From Swiss-Prot:
Protein's name according to its UniProt entry: Glutamyl-tRNA(Gln) amidotransferase subunit A
InterPro entries membership: Amidase, Amidase_CS, Amidase_dom, AS_sf, GatA
Gene name of the record: gatA
Entry's Gene Ontology molecular function annotations: ATP binding; glutaminyl-tRNA synthase (glutamine-hydrolyzing) activity
An annotated GO cellular component: glutamyl-tRNA(Gln) amidotransferase complex
EC numbers for this chain: 6.3.5.7
Species: Francisella tularensis subsp. tularensis (strain WY96-3418)
Record-annotated active site: 74, 149, 173
GO biological process, one term: translation
Role: Allows the formation of correctly charged Gln-tRNA(Gln) through the transamidation of misacylated Glu-tRNA(Gln) in organisms which lack glutaminyl-tRNA synthetase. The reaction takes place in the presence of glutamine and ATP through an activated gamma-phospho-Glu-tRNA(Gln).
Record note on quaternary structure: Heterotrimer of A, B and C subunits.
Keywords annotated in UniProt: ATP-binding, Ligase, Nucleotide-binding, Protein biosynthesis
C-alpha cells in the first residue's frame, strides 16, 4: 500500500511524465489552496526544471524509487535559492544559501520540490494559527485547525497537493496534525535524521518527520532522509533500509503496552476507536499488556520549561543585524534589537522567549530548569524500563478530534493538545501516528512508541495493520490520484 510505488509504476511505464505529474500537482495547489492556505512559497519554475531532469534520468533507465516523485517541505528546512521563512515576519525575505540535509537528500534522489509549507511560527504551536502568513484550514472541515506546528504539511497531503511532505516534531508536531487530518506520520528516533539546515526551536527535542497516507510511504521517505551527517553532531545515523527492513513480516508475538488510565477519560467515540484498534492488533497476533506510563502532566510541565529555555537561546541570534527583519526606524543599537525583535516575532514566539529567559534566570534556574532536566532523565528511564516488557506502547495521538479555529487560543488549553505526544520527544524515542477511527465525523489517530532506534518495529506494525484493515475511509476524495 504505497502512493510512491503507484506513482513509480506510472512514471516508469510512460503513462505519465514527471513534468506532467508535476504540472498536475501545481495546478491543483493553485486552484484549491486558496481555501486551505497550506503553501507559503510555490516553487513552480524550480519544480518544472527538477521534473525535466527526472524525466531525463527515467529515459536513461537510471531512476531510483523516488525519481520524479513530488514533495512539499515544511518551511523551516533550508532550500538553496528559495526563501525559508519559518512562517515568521523575522525571516520573510530570508533566502537560504544552502540546502538542509533533509532537502538535499530528497534532491539527490531525484524528488521534485513543489513548494514550502505553512506552519506555526518557528514551529511553536499546536494549531497552525500562529503563522505570519495566516491560519491553515483542515481539509476535512475548513473551519477547523489542521493541528500544528506542521499543520501545512498535514493539510497539504490530506488535500492531495503532494503524495508526501516533510515536517518537524518537537513535541508532537507531526503526530498531532496527522491525527487531525487522517494521515500517517512519524517522528523517528532522535539522532536518526540530521537537523542541519532545519530552523531550530528546541535543539534537544527537534527531529525531522514525514507525512503520508500510508505507513509504507513514510518508511520509504524516512530511509531517504536518514543517515549520518557531518554537520550535525547529534546525528548518529542508521543503517540502510532501517525503516523498511521488516515491512513484510507479520507482527505475531509483538507485545503492545497500554496504560488504561490514559484512555478511560477520553470521549466515547475515541475510546471506541482505541478499543477496536487494539482488538485488531490482537487479531494480527500481537499481545496487549497493561503498563504504567509516567505522569503525562509532569511530562507536559517538563517540556514547557525546557523547550522555551532552548528556544530563547536559539532565537537570540535574530537581532536585526546578521539576518532577519530589521526595523528601519531604530536610532541606536539597543533600539534596533528591541524594535526588530518586537516587530519580527509573533505573540506565541515572544511568550515562549519570555518563559525561557525566566526559567534560565539565575534566581530561577535551580527551581525550574534544573529540576525539569532532572525529571526528564527520570521519565526517560521509566519509559525505557517499560520496553523491557513490551515492543511498543500504544496511546492516542491527541485527546480530541480537530477543534474549531479560535477555540484554544488560550495558551494552556492549546498546550494540553500535546499531552500524549510529548513523552516521545522528552525521551528521544520514535513514535508513529496513524488513523484509527472517527469522532464527530472527523478522523482521530492512534500512536505507537518504541525503544530508541527500534523505528523499524513501528513501521512494520503499522504497515501490517494498514495492509489488513485499510485506510481508504481516511483519504478524502479530492486527495485521490
Amino acid at each position: 500500500m504505497s502512493y510512491i510505488k503507484k506513482l513509480r509504476a506510472r512514471l516508469d511505464s510512460g503513462e505519465i511524465s514527471a513534468v506532467e505529474l508535476t504540472k498536475e500537482y501545481l495546478a491543483k495547489i493553485k486552484e484549491q489552496d486558496k481555501r486551505i492556505n497550506s503553501v507559503i512559497t510555490l516553487c513552480e519554475a524550480e519544480a518544472l526544471k527538477e521534473a525535466e531532469d527526472a524525466d531525463a534520468i527515467i529515459s536513461a533507465g537510471k531512476q531510483g524509487l523516488l525519481t520524479g516523485i513530488p514533495i512539499l517541505h515544511k518551511d523551516l528546512f533550508c532550500t538553496k535559492g528559495i526563501r525559508t521563512t519559518a512562517a515568521s515576519k523575522m525571516l520573510d525575505n530570508f533566502v537560504a544559501p544552502y540546502d538542509s540535509t533533509v532537502t538535499k537528500n530528497c534532491k539527490d534522489q531525484g524528488m521534485v520540490t513543489l513548494g514550502k509549507l505553512n506552519m506555526d511560527e518557528f514551529a511553536m504551536g499546536s494549531t497552525n494559527e500562529y503563522s505570519y502568513y495566516g491560519a491553515v484550514s483542515n481539509p476535512w472541515d475548513l473551519e477547523r485547525v489542521p493541528g500544528g506546528s506542521s499543520g501545512g504539511s498535514a493539510a497539504a497531503v490530506a488535500a492531495g497537493f503532494a503524495p508526501i511532505s516533510t515536517g518537524s516534531d518537537t513535541g508532537g508536531s507531526v503526530r498531532q496534525p496527522a491525527s487531525f487530518c487522517g494521515l500517517t506520520a512519524m517522528k523517528p528516533s532522535y539522532g536518526s535524521t540530521s537537523r542541519f539546515g532545519m530552523v531550530a526551536f528546541a535543539s534537544s527535542f527537534d527531529q525531522a518527520g514525514i507525512f503520508g497516507h500510508y505507513a509504507e510511504d513514510v518508511a520509504i521517505m524516512l530511509d531517504a532522509i536518514a543517515g549520518e551527517c557531518e554537520f550535525d553532531s547529534t546525528c548518529v545515523g542508521v543503517k540502510q533500509n532501517h525503516f523498511t527492513q521488516d515491512l513484510e513480516k507479520d507482527i505475531s508475538g509483538k507485545v503492545i503496552g497500554v496504560d488504561e488510565s490514559l484512555i478511560k477519560d477520553l470521549p466515547a467515540q475515541i475510546q471506541e476507536a482505541v478499543s477496536k484498534t487494539l482488538d485488531n492488533f490482537k487479531k494480527l497476533g500481537a499481545e496487549i499488556k497493561s503498563v504504567k506510563v509516567p505522569d503525562l502532566k509532569e511530562a507536559l510541565s517538563t517540556y514547557y520549561i525546557i523547550t522555551p529555555a532552548e528556544a530563547a537561546a536559539n532565537l537570540a541570534r535574530y537581532d536585526g543585524i546578521r539576518y532577519g527583519y530589521r526595523n528601519p526606524e531604530a536610532r541606536d543599537l539597543d533600539e534596533l534589537y528591541r524594535k526588530s525583535r518586537t516587530d519580527g516575532f509573533g505573540a506565541e514566539v515572544k511568550r515562549r522567549i519570555m518563559i525561557g529567559n525566566y526559567v534560565l534566570a539565575s534566581s530561577q534556574y535551580d527551581s525550574y530548569y534544573n529540576k525539569a532536566q532532572q525529571l526528564r532523565k527520570v521519565m526517560t528511564d521509566q519509559i525505557n524500563q517499560i520496553f523491557t516488557q513490551v515492543d511498543a506502547i500504544f496511546m492516542p495521538a491527541s485527546p480530541s478530534e480537530a477543534f474549531k479555529k479560535g477555540d484554544k487560543l488560550d495558551p494552556v488549553s492549546a498546550y494540553l493538545s500535546d499531552i500524549y505526544t510529548i513523552p516521545a520527544n522528552i525521551s528521544g524515542l520514535p513514535a508513529i501516528a496513524f488513523p484509527i477511527g472517527f469522532a464527530n465525523n472527523l478522523p482521530v489517530g492512534g500512536q505507537l512508541m518504541a525503544k530508541a532506534f527500534n523505528d523499524n518495529i513501528l513501521t512494520q506494525m503499522v504497515v501490517q495493520y494498514q495492509k489488513h484493515y485499510g485506510i481508504e475511509e481516511f483519504i478524502l476524495q479530492q486527495a485521490r490520484i
